């Protein structure tokens, strides 16, 4: 379980104890059930990180809702959107190994994250990672329920492919934007797992950025 979930669990357990002590114990079942729910909701399972050279992995669990070509500084790029519902794991992971070059917070709306305009209009965190001979942008996008974006890294940090870098509370959307000279490995409607599902493989030269081998360890901070 990620650290952010501990507060919810402890709070509801405390409420259950107080309710059970000052009233009748059956009423304590409700806050206890909520404590179990939040413990499950903020789960943080280990993932097997792919070792494919040039692989771009999904930053989060969810369903692929969009694969389009977008313009980035006058150049065509591929954007894959993954929608996270309330039942998905909400931990976000780096799509590639490399160095974080930019982290930019953008204020915005809290509209339906599945909508086409949410990619630009909604509140979001925009992260640029450079490594393995490529530059990848991924966005943590807020939605109707998800109004709390957490990012645990900073500019200059070196991350491994699939390494935990944050989370979006209560579901939303992550976008990955990368060079169009890549072989896309998923299609719209596919269900993907953060850190382990390969979204695409770049057809570029690769550097020596770190790639975590096997199962990545350690929780989101």
Swiss-Prot record:
Its main location: membrane. Catalyzes the formation of phosphatidylethanolamine (PtdEtn) from phosphatidylserine (PtdSer). It is found in: Cell membrane. InterPro entries: PS_Dcarbxylase, PSD-A. This is Phosphatidylserine decarboxylase proenzyme. Belongs to the phosphatidylserine decarboxylase family. PSD-A subfamily. Heterodimer of a large membrane-associated beta subunit and a small pyruvoyl-containing alpha subunit. Is synthesized initially as an inactive proenzyme. Formation of the active enzyme involves a self-maturation process in which the active site pyruvoyl group is generated from an internal serine residue via an autocatalytic post-translational modification. Two non-identical subunits are generated from the proenzyme in this reaction, and the pyruvate is formed at the N-terminus of the alpha chain, which is derived from the carboxyl end of the proenzyme. The lineage of its organism: Bacteria, Pseudomonadati, Acidobacteriota, Terriglobia, Terriglobales. It catalyses: a 1,2-diacyl-sn-glycero-3-phospho-L-serine + H(+) = a 1,2-diacyl-sn-glycero-3-phosphoethanolamine + CO2. One of its GO terms (cellular component) is plasma membrane. Its cofactor is pyruvate. The active site is at 172 (schiff-base intermediate with substrate). Binds 1 pyruvoyl group covalently per subunit. Pathway: Phospholipid metabolism; phosphatidylethanolamine biosynthesis; phosphatidylethanolamine from CDP-diacylglycerol: step 2/2. Coiled coil: none annotated. It is a peripheral membrane protein. NCBIfam families: PRK05305.2-5. It comes from the Bacteria. Its EC number is 4.1.1.65. GO terms for molecular function: phosphatidylserine decarboxylase activity.
